[in-house]
Structures are given as structure tokens and as C-alpha cells.
């Protein structure tokens, strides 16, 4: 209805503009579509525009002057009356498709602009009115381009306690670029729209969900606690599950569902596990309540989850991302090591346990890998965990190869009044010795950030077997630390044999330093000959590797397939609420 209404107004505008151009000021060349038809009095328009801008607040004045002073205060929209309606139509068409990006068209206020511009008479212009129309159109255009290029929300404002990646914002260079030439409007509108593969994949998913939003399906009844539907069994919910999977295409449609899927058969299991892989659910041979909860989620809800993650993809860090970088999706508890757009490594991670120990969203440069690190225990762990443990397990400190210091002098654990420690009184430092039992494992990855968060190995590998891995105090434990360390080393040209040999020897020294066998002939020969091989304590990374700890509940997998995961930190709701109320 809105689109039809806007089309009707635009038809009227087009007629008015055409009539004004044909009759105004005797422009005989107007029949030639290449000719330019100017406003009857450009000087009067310029003055009206200056007056209108002067009435705005300081921030808006600054932006408008950045736009119009380089143009000599001439119109961006009405500089050529032959093309004015065409440009407005082009802008309106783009706005009408904003739901393809998860943004409501109503946010831009285009309907109000069209209503206002439909009353313009360009034969005898009311220049203050024309100046107002100019700015209204400019506001819509700027809102669209800046939102698509940089996002419609500032995540640091939206998540003040969780998000600490400063993102890019529109600057004067951006303003100049989108207003540099009014004849290239379509180019600027297109350029503002993200085009990377992940964004386009999520757009396609959004489109599918838009088509399914009105689909109604029978909810699958929740099972009693500790109950599941096992493969090969008959259950009343099995045909209901089958119908739900047919809607989203994991299962081919059949009319006689009740008879074909009376039993939880292999075909249904295969389709169900495709669904579970998409939603990062545990893949097994039974149906439990977590799977049922995901199947029962309505398509409207899923639509807004995708829309929220499209917005996240529009947020770009202010600082440059190195070509080789590490991306941790805290939501999915997964790390990807990337070179450009190519994923070279994927591994599981353990992230902070909500709500008290959430891993913050951060940007930093990894500058070193520490081998066989010691662990200085955070105060919060000393006060809230170790002090309590020591009251009933006095050997805990010595058994875990920890030392206690006060004023840099080592003290015995029994000398510490553990029960008295609090946020007001905690003068002790607890350090765990390096080695295989150290909580940081054998490798620690330091990157610049204000929270002393780092990536590290662990002495407890069992956590990586768990589906849910929100278990740490905020730092990120990595499943394959040695592979990550080798990825972060300085790149070497494979055609340079000498450099490749140096790199291989460095990798061998890292292996040897953390207690693993050497693999190069040079390394093995040195050990066989009894030569001393110096163990490394740290490896400096130059020029450094970008680390991004980010949060995405909808993303693409290694093969480009769209996946979802549980919103463990409950960060979707604020963003979705903002998108729904964006006006």
C-alpha cells in the first residue's frame, strides 16, 4: 500500500516537473534529454538554503555546509529539472527495498518527503519551500548511505558493558564522496550497500524468511523432562517434526506425512541433523527439547535475528584489520584464522561464562606468543574461589604448583588469612608455575586490549568435547594452540627456500620448547648429536596479527552456508528492539 501510495505521488511529481520544464522560462532545448534545465533563479535558492540551514543545530549545520559549500550552495536534487523526478524516484526505489537489509522503509521518512515535494511548483518556485524539500531529500539520502555503510546503531552505545570495538563513523570524506556529483546518484547508492559474501548470504536467508513469515505450522509439544524421541521409534510428534522440516526444505514434501513418518526413520534423522547443523545444535540420533525449541521458533523471530546480524556486519572497526587475522565468534564459541576472506583454520574455543564473566567484544593486535607461561591469578578468583577452597583443602596451593607473594616476597600459604580476604583486603599475589599443569597450558597469545584478556592453551582439554563452552572467567581458551601459533608467525614466500628453512626451524624450536618432538632434519640431528637447543620463552610477532572478539548469532560457515547459534549472552534482544522501533 505504501509503495503504491509513493508511486502515485511520484507520478504527480514527474508531471509537475515536466510541466514546469516545458513552460518555464522558454527553455526550447528541454526536448533534448541531454540538456540541463536550471531553476529560474539560482541565487534566490542559494539564499533560501543558507537561511534554512542557519536555523538548524550546530552539528547539522556543519554537515549541510560540508555538502553544499563545495557546490556553491547549489541544489543537489534540483540542479537539473529534467532529472529531478528521476533522482527522487531512484532514491525512493532504494528506500522501498531497505527491508532486504532488515531496515524498515518507514525509518527514512520518505513518504513525508514525497508528500511535501508533490506540492512544489517549479515554474514559480517558493524558494524557502524548495530549500526545505532539498534538505528533506538530503536527510533521507544521507541516512540511507551512512546507515548502510557504517550501521544504523553505534554498538558501543548499544552495549556499553560488553562492546569495546570502536567502529567507523561517517566523516567529511564520506560526505564529500556521496555528494560529489548529483548525476551519479545510482552509483553512490549502490556503493553504500555492503557486498561481501557473508552479507549477501545473510541477505538471501533474510529473503527466504520474509517469504516464510506468514507460514503457520503446528508447534511440536514439549517433552517431559529427561525424555527424548529415539531414532527408530514411533511417537505422535514425529509427523509434526516432519511437516516442520518440509516447510524449510530440509525434507522433501509428501502428502501422506502421517504414514510415511509414523516412525522416526533414517530419512527424517538425516533431514533433522541438517537442520541441527544449521542451528549449531548437538547432532545425535534422538529428538530432545532443545531441538524442539529450535523447530518451534517462528520465522518472524528468525527474520529479526538475521536482520540484527546484517547490522553487525555493517559495523567496521576504526582500526585496520591485517590481511591475516584471528576472528573469535564469542556467540558460537569458535575461532577462525583467516587470510583475507579465506578461512585457513577453524577451532573450538572456551569463552567467558555469563552473566558475571562474559568475554568482552574487543579489537587488538597480537604482538607475542608466550611459551610455558606462568599464570598470575586474578584477584576475583583469589577472593571468590581460592580463598574458599583453602578453608577446606589446605594443600590446594601446593598441589597446583602455586606460590603466594606479599609485597614481592614469597610467603607460605598457611600464613595467609584466607577467610579474611575480600575486595577491601587482598594484599596477596598468587602465581602458578609454568608447565603442563598450568591453567594457561603451554602457549599464551598476548594482544593489546584494556582488559588483560588473552587467548591461551589449557591444561583441561575436556571442555572442548562439550557442546556449550561458556565456562571461563573471560579469557579465551583455544583448542589447537600450536596450529594457531604457527598461523600467526611471519609469512614466508614458499619459493624462498632459505626463509622456508628458517621458518621450519622456528616452528621446531617452538615444539621443542613446549615439550614436543622436533620434525625438521636439522632439529632432530642437533638433538642426536647432543647439541644444546635453547628453549624459547616468547616469540615476537611482527607486524602483528589482528584479533577480533566479536558476537554473531547468524553467520556463514566455511562452505558459505548460513548458520545460527544460541544467543548465550542475550545480546540480540536490544539490537532487534532497536531495529523494530527504528523510525
Protein language model regions, located:
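Cationic-aromatic interfacial patches
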Residues: 22-168
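Well-ordered beta-sheet/strand-loop patches within structured domains
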Residues: 2, 20-65, 69-70, 142, ...
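Bacterial N-terminal signal peptides that target proteins for export
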Residues: 1-9
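Bacterial N-terminal signal peptides
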Residues: 8-18
